[in-house]
């Protein structure tokens, strides 16, 4: 009798722990789904509400990304969350449609991230050509290609059952029934489909993103060093003017603070790009590694032998959710620039989200020969908001000839733009969006 009581107590403890685990899982997954819904809905609502956000072509790609992530939160995550909490798949034959939605929405999200990286690299490396070529029509074509490719590798193979591996076999050698398969909604991918879909959905896009963001960093690094050179020239000229006021010839030293500021800016750009790539890779890479490994698992081997490439379902599901979690982080990474922050604060009714900074901004003016003729600090509020940025393109300091660029020449002209004023904001958030190029008269192109 005491033995039976002990056994019942242990079973009750196991049931209680299992129930507690399910409750914690439900709370965590609910928060993840709600945060994904809220963030991406805010992005869509901001663009619908504020016309100036729709006027920027680069925001079209952010909207497409938000829509794909919103579909992940509506069509994919809730159904899997219910199955995780219930311990089985309660939606029957909806499994195949859900698998197609999962592949389509996740692929669309990743491809939109890839398109954004290409768009920002093109905008930063060739701003004049970007201004002419990247029209709303061109943006819609790129977005349509991303979504069409996502549909083609999801619904067509799934509906034709090209994605499935061989039917699962039970221990007695019989093929598992349809009901047993539907209880789990386990889509055992074939080796061919797993590798080909992973290449299109992840490996090729991530390779493109690595190349584009690496080149963006190199361009930004060159630009920051050019700005630092202008700073040093401005401070040097100011120091010399102050020290030679009495007519004496005094040697003027170059300040070390400018070198430190240059390093600080380069580090900030590197951190920004590292966050963009790091979050994406950390979320999706583990899943796609497992996605290519699992089809090679030999589950028919005897229990005593080792089974390489075999992963338990819990581990696989954890990394699936890691990938979907990227959809909740994308609005924070890609839509939290100044324009979107102001729109969010207006929509939410909390205007203190975007406090106005009071740090000083240095204005450096350069004459036609490249000599610095004025350098002074002004409060941030006295500078137009259109100028309150850090240029991340070489053309912001040295002008280019659009005709030369169109013909294939990419070398900047030696002379600087006449009366060009460069705004050097020390604390502004770095943005990798399109920056309006500067024309030959030193004004921003409208």
UniProtKB/Swiss-Prot annotation:
Residues 49-59, 119-137, 218-271, 341-446 are cytoplasmic. The chain crosses the membrane at residues 23-48, 60-86, 96-118, 138-162, 192-217, 272-298, 316-340. The keyword Ribonucleoprotein does not apply. It comes from the Eukaryota. Signal peptide: none annotated. PROSITE patterns: G_PROTEIN_RECEP_F1_1, G_PROTEIN_RECEP_F1_2. Glycans are attached at residue 4. Residues 1-22, 87-95, 163-191, 299-315 are extracellular. A lipid is attached at residues 350, 354 (S-palmitoyl cysteine). It is a multi-pass membrane protein. It is found in: Cell membrane; Endoplasmic reticulum membrane; Cell projection, Cilium membrane; Cell projection, Dendrite. SMART domains: 7TM_GPCR_Srsx. CDD domains: 7tmA_D1A_dopamine_R. GO terms for cellular component: ciliary membrane; dendritic spine; endoplasmic reticulum membrane. GO terms for molecular function: dopamine neurotransmitter receptor activity, coupled via Gs; G protein-coupled receptor activity. Belongs to the G-protein coupled receptor 1 family. Interacts with DNAJC14 via its C-terminus. PANTHER family: ADRENERGIC RECEPTOR-RELATED G-PROTEIN COUPLED RECEPTOR, D(1A) DOPAMINE RECEPTOR. This is D(1A) dopamine receptor. It comes from Didelphis virginiana (North American opossum). The gene is DRD1.
């Amino acid at each position: 009798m005491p033995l039976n009581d002990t056994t019942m107590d242990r079973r009750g403890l196991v049931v209680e722990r299992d129930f507690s685990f399910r409750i914690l899982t439900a709370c965590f997954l609910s928060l993840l789904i709600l945060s994904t819904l809220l963030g991406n809905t805010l992005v869509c609502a901001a663009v619908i509400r504020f016309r100036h956000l729709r006027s920027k072509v680069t925001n079209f790609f952010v909207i497409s990304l938000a829509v794909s992530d919103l579909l992940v939160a509506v069509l994919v995550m809730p159904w899997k969350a219910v199955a995780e909490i219930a311990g089985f798949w309660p939606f029957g034959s909806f499994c195949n449609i859900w698998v197609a939605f999962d592949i389509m929405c996740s692929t669309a999200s990743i491809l939109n991230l890839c398109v954004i990286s290409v768009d920002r690299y093109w905008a930063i490396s060739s701003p004049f050509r970007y201004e002419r070529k990247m029209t709303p029509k061109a943006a819609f074509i790129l977005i349509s290609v991303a979504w069409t490719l996502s549909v083609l590798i999801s619904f067509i193979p799934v509906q034709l059952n090209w994605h499935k591996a061989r039917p699962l076999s039970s221990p007695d050698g019989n093929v598992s029934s349809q009901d047993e398969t539907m209880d789990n909604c386990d889509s055992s991918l074939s080796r061919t489909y797993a590798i080909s879909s992973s290449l299109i959905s992840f490996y090729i896009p991530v390779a493109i993103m690595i190349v584009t963001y690496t080149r963006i960093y190199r361009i930004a690094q060159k630009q920051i060093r050019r700005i630092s050179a202008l700073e040093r020239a401005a401070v040097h000229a100011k120091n010399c003017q102050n020290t030679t006021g009495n007519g004496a010839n005094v040697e003027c030293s170059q300040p070390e603070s400018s070198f430190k500021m240059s390093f600080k800016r380069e580090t900030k750009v590197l951190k920004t790009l590292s966050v963009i790539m790091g979050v994406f890779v950390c979320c999706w890479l583990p899943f796609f590694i497992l996605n290519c490994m699992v089809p090679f698992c030999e589950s028919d081997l005897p229990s005593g032998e080792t089974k390489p490439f075999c992963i338990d379902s819990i581990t696989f599901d954890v990394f699936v959710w890691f990938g979907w979690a990227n959809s909740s982080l994308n609005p924070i990474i890609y839509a939290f620039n100044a324009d979107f922050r102001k729109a969010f604060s207006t929509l939410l009714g909390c205007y203190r989200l975007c406090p106005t900074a009071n740090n000083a901004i240095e204005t450096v003016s350069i004459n036609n020969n490249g000599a610095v003729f004025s350098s002074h600090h002004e409060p941030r509020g006295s500078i137009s908001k259109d100028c309150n940025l850090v240029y991340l393109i070489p053309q912001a300091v040295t002008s280019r000839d659009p005709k030369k660029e169109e013909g294939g020449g990419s070398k900047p002209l030696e002379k600087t733009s006449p009366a060009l004023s460069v705004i050097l904001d020390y604390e502004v958030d770095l943005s990798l969006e399109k920056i309006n190029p500067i024309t030959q008269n030193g004004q921003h192109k409208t």
